[in-house]
Amino acid sequence: NNQPQRILVLRSKEALALADGCARSHFDSPVMLVVSYDPADAWIREEDGKNHGEIDAAIATTQMMLQAADLGLGTTYIGMFDPEKLRAAFPEELAGLVPIALLALGYPAENARPSRLHTERKPLEEMVRYR
């Protein structure tokens, strides 16, 4: 486990505003995590050259989301963002890194509910095969 994930924690109003300019969804969270990975640190599968940096960063993101929920915090995984704008907004912090997600973090509003796209599930038969 090479741990290629890199987390940029955005807390200032200025930094949060810069991140907002890179994404189509905004959640007014007091903290935004920029989850990236360093390709130079990522494990490469020998058999086909697959770089696992994105996978490792996604696993770390899932663990952060679970830990946040245990602490009573809400998170929203944002994959719809412009990585080039994000790199331009944070050139020093993201130099050489590949951003994979923004993670909005904070206490959810009392009336907050996930959209139906986040609760509807395909039938298990469409996703799992047995042999």
Regions found by a protein language model. Give the residues of each.
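Glycine/small-residue-rich phosphate/adenosyl-binding loop
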Residues: 1-57
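Solvent-exposed alpha-helices and their adjacent loops that cap or buttress functional pockets
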Residues: 1-2, 25-27, 92-96, 119-121
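Short secondary-structure junction motifs
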Residues: 2-5, 73, 100
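A short, acidic/glycine-rich surface segment
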Residues: 17-20, 42-43, 86-88, 110-114
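Small-aliphatic-rich amphipathic alpha-helix that forms the alpha element of a beta-alpha
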Residues: 33, 41, 48-89
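Short secondary-structure boundary segments
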Residues: 37, 80, 107
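C-terminal helix-cap and adjacent tail motif
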Residues: 101-131
